[in-house]
A protein has these predicted regions:
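Alpha-helical membrane segments and adjacent membrane-interface helices in multi-pass membrane proteins
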Residues: 1-30, 34
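Membrane-embedded alpha-helical segments of transport systems
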Residues: 6, 61-70, 115-124
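Hydrophobic alpha-helical transmembrane segments in multi-pass integral membrane proteins
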Residues: 10, 64-82
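Helix-boundary and loop/linker segments of multi-pass membrane transporters
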Residues: 14-19, 48-50, 99-105
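Residue-level signature of transmembrane alpha-helical entry/exit and packing/kink sites
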Residues: 21, 25, 29, 52-56, ...
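Alpha-helical transmembrane segments of polytopic integral membrane proteins
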Residues: 36, 40-41, 71, 127-130
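Internal alpha-helical transmembrane segments of multi-pass membrane proteins
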Residues: 49-65
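Alpha-helical transmembrane segments and their cytosolic interface
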Residues: 77, 83-144
Length: 144
C-alpha cells in the first residue's frame, strides 16, 4: 500500500517538464506491485515445503514476470493511452529489433524484457545467500 501511495504522491511533484511521475507510471507501478506481490507470496507459500530453492525461485519468476508485464503494458502500451492522453509516450512505440537482435517490436517491449532479465539475474544470484540462511537457520542439518 505504501508503494502505491508513493507512486501517486510522485504524480504531484512537479519538475521542469511536468510531474516527475506520470499518472500512467503510477498506475502501472502500483498495479504491477500489488498483483505481483500477492501472487509471489501465494506461490511461495504453496511451494515452501519442497526443495529449498523451489519456493523462492518459482515465486520470484512468476511475480517478476507479472510485475514487468503489467507495469510496461500499462505505462507504455498504445492500448492504454486513455489512462493519460496528455502524456506523450509515443517514443516507446518505435518499432526496433528486440534487445537490438531479435524480431521487431515496440521499444517498450525491449525495455520490459531487459528489466525482466535483470530481475531474473538478481533472483538467481540471491539464491546463494538464501541457501546459506536456510541452512544456518534450519533446525535440521539435512536440507534438501
Amino acid at each position: 500500500v505504501v508503494g502505491i501511495i508513493c507512486s501517486f504522491i510522485g504524480t504531484q511533484i512537479m519538475g521542469e517538464f511536468g510531474p516527475l511521475v506520470t499518472l500512467r507510471i503510477a498506475i502501472g507501478s502500483g498495479t504491477a506491485f500489488l498483483v505481483a506481490q500477492l501472487v509471489d507470496v501465494f506461490v511461495f507459500n504453496r511451494l515452501r515445503s519442497g526443495a529449498w530453492w523451489r519456493a523462492p525461485l518459482a515465486s520470484t519468476l512468476i511475480g517478476s514476470s507479472l510485475d514487468t508485464a503489467i507495469f510496461f503494458t500499462l505505462a507504455f502500451s498504445a492500448s492504454f493511452v486513455f489512462l493519460e492522453p496528455m502524456n506523450d509516450v509515443s517514443w516507446s512505440w518505435e518499432v526496433l529489433p528486440i534487445l537490438g537482435l531479435g524480431p521487431e517490436a515496440p521499444l517498450w517491449v525491449s525495455l520490459g524484457i531487459a528489466d525482466w532479465l535483470v530481475k531474473l539475474s538478481l533472483a538467481l544470484i540471491a539464491l546463494i545467500p538464501f541457501r546459506v540462511l536456510v541452512s544456518r537457520l534450519s533446525p535440521t542439518t539435512n536440507a534438501v
